[in-house]
């Protein structure tokens, strides 16, 4: 026989049904069906089954009860739900909403919960001493947290700025920046690298022999002497000997 939850959801039920133990704490069969339909509409049928399957068997009744109270509290107080109503001292309204659902009634949001008797947006009212202390402690924690974050971001920014300043103040950096800032007076479009030209001294200048023409007899080979060497042999020959070299520039 199908349980009341599976019956209203029109799904198959078996002996290992995960929904059956979740609604056994509700007294009547109609109330079980109303609670199942309300929770399934709020969280979705697949979401409800996923929540139930994610917890052990012993915790499933408490889970379904928590989902029912949260769905009713969120319907009545859309901003903070059941937790906000418990915090502001309006838990009796949440319990009344649950009883209304079990009887088959409908719920609607109550705007007065946001501004009347519970502070703005569900926060504790200043008239409650305990609630004021809790709210003050939370605000102090938030301010300290934000101050720490600001100090952290400021220190990161300061360290990065000082590091960039130190980098820009190095001699190599300044030299490179100054060379980049100076405009070039001419365009260097030459493919030959600009190396310093060594000026030949008069003492090292030697007279080159006349290149033979194409019609001359010595166009194939040219004769050079090694008489300019001060001392020592050249290519293993004695000083003053002549060597014939092939003239490739014909």
Swiss-Prot record:
Organism ancestry: Eukaryota, Viridiplantae, Streptophyta, Embryophyta, Tracheophyta
GO molecular-function term, one example from the UniProt record: transcription cis-regulatory region binding
Tissues in which the protein is found: Expressed in young shoots, roots, stems, leaves and flowers.
Taxonomic superkingdom: Eukaryota
Disulfide-linked positions: none
Any one GO BP annotation for this protein: simple leaf morphogenesis
Gene name linked to the record: LBD37
Protein name: LOB domain-containing protein 37
Residue stretches making up the LOB domain: 1-107
InterPro entries per record: LOB
Family: Belongs to the LOB domain-containing protein family.
Organism: Arabidopsis thaliana (Mouse-ear cress)
Annotated Pfam families: LOB
Region (Disordered): 145-227
Low complexity bias spans: 157-170
